[in-house]
Amino acid sequence: MVAGEASGDTLGADLILSLKKRFPNARFVGIGGQKMIANGFESWYPLEKLSVMGLFEVLKHLPSLLRLRKELIQKLLQLKPDVFIGIDAPDFNFKMEGILKENAIPTIHYVGPSVWAWREKRLLKICKQVDGVLVLFPFETAYYDKYGIPSKFVGHPLTNQVADSPDKHSARQQLGLSSDTPVTGILPGSRSSEINLMIDVYVQVATKLHEAYPQMKFVIPCVNQAAKERVALSISLYGKGIDFILLDQQAQLAMAASDQLIVTSGTATLEAALMQRPLILAIKLHPISYWIMKRLATTKWVGLPNVLAGKCIVPELIQENATVDKIAQTLDKLITDKEMREVQLTEFKKQYDALNQNASELAADAVVKWAKLKND
């Protein structure tokens, strides 16, 4: 098994436990994080070696990543495992899966790449690299069927995490907020590029909302210290006299405590929907990135709740529409329009129910079937 980041470590850890029920003496090796290791996984290299984000960062680390992949392939060809499971990290794993498959080692990829959003033609190559793909969304299987790739929808792990998150009352207690205080959560993203493009806009939006709702407080989870400092700088410039609560990570706590959210796109939009919090999506990209995305994108929407609904239930303010005035007006409408909130919440409940599957058990069943595993 090779997991590429923290989310993959969680998926891998759960899958190991489910496979151990079926094969108590199985050995699990490759690259994994602390959760996988805690469940008996033997990690040959630290997970952090693969946790590289952003084009520049990947290019900087490319020689060492290619060297690592070459070493891994050699080790695995020597070992000849009964099955190889690549967890996410598509740019790293698919090439490796293809070589292992050519050498008669069954290969399975867990978390299908977002071919439904862009570059669907990747599946022409992927069909030669894997014996099956485990996907997180029900609509994804149709894409794999089209290219003759076995796939199985196993549900989304966020449903389990959300089930363990605090309710609004306990979240507010933790933050020292009363139950009748109006609270808006602001999620500016996890990458520095997202934060730099959006945080000044968001703080100015908060200033406008504060004029209309003087009692309103704003909760902002910050992914790391650098993000926290950038947010604090923005507040000192545009948000003086307004009550902001900055958290160290704790995005789910921020969501749980909030009445509504402003979210930069990504997994956070789905997380907010699964936590049943009304939201709007706002995002600005670098002009070149936006141009490329517009040319390659095959979906009408950016936010996962809209993709899952097949219609626009969450307002999306993108690029030139992501202005202070437009975001503030849209959020004000979300606060005051009960029907708009109800439409979102009804759809979010359906999405939670659809994605709330026993993912690791379903994944283990598919692995056994596709890799033709037997208890000797």
UniProtKB/Swiss-Prot annotation:
Q: What is this protein called?
A: Lipid-A-disaccharide synthase
* Pathway annotation: Bacterial outer membrane biogenesis; LPS lipid A biosynthesis
TM helices/strands, residue ranges: none
Instruction: Report the source organism.
Output: Hydrogenovibrio crunogenus (strain DSM 25203 / XCL-2) (Thiomicrospira crunogena)
Q: What is its EC number?
A: 2.4.1.182
GO terms of molecular function: lipid-A-disaccharide synthase activity; phospholipid binding
**Known role:** Condensation of UDP-2,3-diacylglucosamine and 2,3-diacylglucosamine-1-phosphate to form lipid A disaccharide, a precursor of lipid A, a phosphorylated glycolipid that anchors the lipopolysaccharide to the outer membrane of the cell.
One Gene Ontology term from the biological process aspect of the record: lipid A biosynthetic process
* Record-linked InterPro entries: Glyco_trans_19 (IPR003835)
Catalytic activity reads: a lipid X + a UDP-2-N,3-O-bis[(3R)-3-hydroxyacyl]-alpha-D-glucosamine = a lipid A disaccharide + UDP + H(+)
Source domain of life is Bacteria
Which family would the database say this protein is a member of? Belongs to the LpxB family.
Q: Write the record's keywords in alphabetical order, separated by commas.
A: Glycosyltransferase, Lipid A biosynthesis, Lipid biosynthesis, Lipid metabolism, Transferase
Q: Which GO terms describe its cellular component?
A: membrane
